[in-house]
Regions:
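Non-transmembrane, aqueous-exposed alpha-helical and coiled segments at domain scale
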Residues: 2-495
Length: 495
């Protein structure tokens, strides 16, 4: 596809204008300079041609791929692997985690208070134990998820030592795999770091449980380092800011090391690290049906290597409908704060939320981010725990007005969404509503919100990969109904 005549005339006039200005000052284009202008013209022409071609091909793709929505009902398709009553389609069994938010009675979904269970233990009990003993609890949760039992003091100490040994990245990894190929998106950088780890593993294709466990423990340990270094590279090469590469300390917890690595002075308080540790515990596992954990099961069922399976899970978690939702909450709250003059005025806040739900404000999708969940109905226990902890930190930092704004969003949104949609579905705040606010109060940059989710969830992913290898046995192969008619092939000269 050639450059249009109008575009060519513009380029010619531009060239003549520049040449005329230079002639006026006694300067003329050299043959080499004229050649450069011609090359530039060709490059612009190629870019325009490519853009027009892509637009044309996109139009063809859009016109050929739509599917009549009525066909999903006709063929009883479980879209999103959901049943008509909102429950999930049963595709597997797991003993790792459970997400409880409803019961099914007489075929109907009945709302009940939310519970999050790790290997049979309520996550609230795990958090309470860590707080009572003034200890970091994420590492104990990782042990529990991997091995199905609570560790003794000696077992936990051995496990922490093992994690500490692996926190440092392999020799030359930082220089070759992070600094030489920085990324504007930390989740993409994390996925690449996971895949690159394959090349530094002497036995990457060994699928024995002992080797897979060794690989998973190394990844659990290194995720915080990979994320922090990816962030530092972004600061240097994309943000034009100073880059600080600190060594992780083996004696520190995951939360402590992460705060140490992202801050230029390596400083953090115990309260900051304990609050981040709480967030890591709450995000470590969420059953086998969430998108990224299911991805681990699906990809692992194909008998691929650990790095490919975990890298795929990182890609899933990055999605705006999954782990990326916490950033969307933060952006929505920015919009609310900009457009609501009086944050303490309930009527004004409620009115603006109604505009968002009615597609009249913010991004006009009608979604109030941080509200609603596939399983939780009355409450998301993770959101409840984070909300209570956020209250204390907000008081300490003088951010009570902003905290109360978040609470109003939680309080008003269920009624607003019910009135808008009227489908009878109970809606509660999910963990994303408060997680970003907590991270921002810890002075954690927004681009690290979703990577923090991954730093936590790698423990659950690892447990699900091992479970799939031990108990899976079959490759995932669900059915897709083809709805296109057969056609007679047409030779190219007759099309």
């Amino acid at each position: 596809m050639a450059i249009t005549e109008k575009e060519r005339e513009y380029l010619e006039s531009l060239k003549e204008k520049i040449e005329g200005q230079l002639h006026g000052s006694g300067v003329k284009f050299s043959d080499r300079e004229i050649e450069h202008i011609s090359l530039l013209e060709n490059r612009i022409s190629q870019k325009i041609d490519e853009k027009l071609l892509i637009e044309k091909l996109s139009s063809i793709a859009k016109s050929n791929d739509p599917i009549d929505k009525s066909l999903y009902d006709k063929y009883d398709v479980k879209r999103g692997l959901r049943n008509a009553n909102g429950t999930g389609v049963l595709v597997g069994l797991t003993s790792i985690g459970d997400v409880v938010g409803y019961e099914v009675k007489d075929g109907q979904k009945v709302a009940i208070p939310g519970r999050l269970i790790y290997r049979g233990y309520n996550v609230e009990a795990l958090i309470k134990d860590a707080e009572e003993h003034n200890q970091f609890g994420y590492e104990q949760c990782a042990y529990l998820l991997l091995f199905g039992k609570l560790p003794t003091a000696d077992e936990l100490a051995e496990f922490n030592d093992l994690l500490g040994v692996h926190r440092t990245l392999p020799e030359n990894f930082t220089e070759d795999m992070i600094m030489k190929a920085p990324s504007a998106d930390i989740m993409n950088k994390l996925a690449r770091g996971v895949l690159a780890s394959y090349s530094y593993d002497p036995n990457p294709e060994d699928r024995s449980i002992s080797n897979v466990l060794h690989q998973c423990i190394a990844l659990i340990s290194r995720f915080s380092t990979l994320t922090a270094y990816g962030y530092q590279a972004k600061r240097r090469y994309y943000d034009g800011k100073s880059m600080y590469i600190h060594n992780p300390l083996p004696e520190l917890s995951t939360a402590e090391n992460f705060l140490r690595l992202i801050r230029n002075n390596k400083a953090f308080t115990d309260d900051e690290a304990k609050l981040l540790d709480l967030a890591l515990i709450l995000h470590a596992e969420h059953g086998g049906g969430n998108n990224s954990s299911l991805t681990v099961h699906v990809v692992s069922s194909a008998d691929t290597d650990t790095y490919s399976a975990i890298g795929a899970a990182v890609g899933s978690l990055k999605g705006r409908r999954h782990g990326g939702a916490n950033i969307q909450v933060a952006e929505m709250m920015d919009n609310i704060k900009e457009n609501v003059k009086d944050w303490s005025n309930e009527n004004e806040v409620k009115s603006y939320l109604e505009k968002i739900a009615n597609k009249e404000a913010y991004n006009r999708t009608g979604l109030i981010y941080g509200m609603g969940h596939a399983v939780y109905t009355i409450n998301d226990p993770r959101a409840t725990l984070l909300r209570d902890k956020a209250a204390k930190l907000a008081r300490e930092k003088g951010l009570e007005e902003e905290y109360n704004l978040y609470k109003m969003v939680e309080r008003f949104s269920p009624e607003i969404l019910y009135n808008m949609h009227g489908d009878g579905k109970k809606i509660c705040a999910n963990v994303d509503l408060y997680s970003g606010f907590v991270y921002s109060m810890l002075n954690i940059p927004r681009e690290l919100f979703t990577p923090l989710f991954a730093i936590s969830r790698i423990a659950g992913w690892s447990a699900h990969r091992i479970e799939e290898i031990i108990a899976g046995g079959k490759i995932y192969r669900p059915a897709y109904k083809n709805i296109s008619a057969e056609r007679e092939y047409v030779p190219i000269e007759k099309r």
